[in-house]
């Protein structure tokens, strides 16, 4: 992978292969879906299932999503070039979700520094497929798995590039001129280190598109695009990875999922006043919780605080903002955390236990790094 002078992976050079011209800012005149086709917009930062660390993409939830036969147009937000296409027919390294996959992912270059990323398209438009060579086109339209492949297909603002239906559309903006400060060690993210350049989509949409998106947005406080970077040196807040597990990429040979070594202390993507504890291996499964009493605040916890105890409870707000009625309010488990020198953390989860039943770490405690 090409490297920048600051030591970060040069994603612009990798995606565009030196063919891009110009730099941002770029103005998006179209939403990725027509506003009238969208039920809601969920911003960056959710933690759910295998997304243990705050999620690096937003969600456009189409209307009639339960009807998988209904398809909606997916649009290019601005002029550019599709530079990466991928086709997924299975989720490798995981048995968490037993569904049939047939998803398309795209990266669009809008300048030498600004890119958009799409995922979960159910099909690609003929205007895109017809610009590809026959072998690649056959592979994309078949049932075979195709890793992300570099291409160069020109698109215009508002052009239909595919369809989505029966699922959400993933969308994110990357600006390689910006570096998020809340990722202390970008190298731990490997082939996912472009997330350190994730940019708030509301900063790029033209006023009319931005206004439409704000109406659809389930988050009503700034930053409206959400947040994913929470690391603070010497503090508990942020992302952690099981020591020796390969960072964010994790263990791809673990059938339970690469995320089993992930751990995050963050804030809710819709109500950022709420503390989230997201654990990749909570009794063998990924789980995300609120904290009873909404304290202690992980942003205030450091080495001098020693072993800190969290009582974990179910969130009363769902990932798309729905309020859960009648959910258990009892404690679902306990987490112990101790910030160590050298960006290390000692951590142990106790599913089904209460604070009174946990007196300290056991031999099951593990060390995390970042």
List each model region and its residues.
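Short, surface-exposed secondary-structure edge patches
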Residues: 71-74, 144-153
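Surface-exposed, glycine-biased beta-strand/turn segments
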Residues: 1-105, 156-157, 198-202, 206-318, ...
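Beta-sheet ligand-binding and adhesion/scaffold domains
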Residues: 295-370
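Short, solvent-exposed aromatic-acidic interface loops
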Residues: 121-124, 281-285, 350-356
């Amino acid at each position: 992978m090409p490297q920048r002078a600051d030591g970060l992976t040069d994603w612009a050079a990798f995606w565009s292969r030196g063919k891009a011209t110009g730099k941002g800012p770029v103005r998006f005149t179209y939403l990725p879906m027509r506003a009238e086709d969208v039920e809601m917009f969920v911003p960056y930062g959710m933690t759910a299932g295998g997304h243990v660390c705050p999620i690096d993409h937003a969600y456009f939830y189409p209307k009639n999503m339960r009807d998988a036969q209904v398809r909606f147009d997916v649009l290019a937000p601005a002029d550019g070039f599709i530079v990466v296409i991928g086709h997924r027919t299975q989720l490798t390294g995981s048995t968490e979700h037993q569904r049939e996959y047939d998803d398309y992912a795209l990266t669009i270059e809008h300048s030498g520094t600004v890119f958009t990323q799409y995922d979960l398209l159910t099909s690609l438009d003929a205007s895109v497929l017809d610009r590809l060579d026959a072998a690649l086109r056959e592979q994309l339209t078949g049932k075979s798995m195709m890793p992300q492949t570099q291409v160069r297909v020109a698109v215009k603002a508002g052009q239909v590039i595919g369809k989505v239906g029966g699922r959400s559309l993933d969308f994110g903006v990357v600006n390689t001129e910006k570096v998020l400060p809340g990722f202390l060690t970008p190298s731990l993210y490997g082939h996912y280190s472009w997330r350190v350049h994730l940019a708030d989509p509301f900063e790029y949409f033209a006023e009319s598109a931005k206004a439409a998106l704000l109406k659809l947005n389930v988050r009503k406080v700034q930053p409206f695009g959400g947040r994913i970077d929470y690391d603070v040196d010497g503090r508990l807040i942020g992302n952690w990875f099981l020591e020796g597990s390969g960072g964010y990429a994790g263990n791809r040979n673990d059938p339970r999922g690469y995320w089993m070594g992930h751990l995050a202390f963050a804030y809710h993507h819709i109500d950022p006043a709420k503390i989230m504890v997201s654990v990749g291996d909570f009794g063998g499964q990924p789980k995300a919780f609120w904290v009873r009493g909404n304290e202690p605040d992980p942003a205030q916890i450091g080495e001098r605080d020693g072993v800190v105890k969290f009582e974990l409870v179910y969130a009363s707000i769902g990932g798309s903002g729905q309020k859960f009625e009648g959910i258990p309010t009892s404690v679902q488990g306990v987490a112990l955390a101790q910030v160590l020198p050298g960006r290390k953390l000692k951590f142990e989860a106790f599913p089904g236990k209460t604070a009174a039943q946990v007196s300290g770490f056991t031999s099951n405690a593990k060390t995390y790094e970042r």
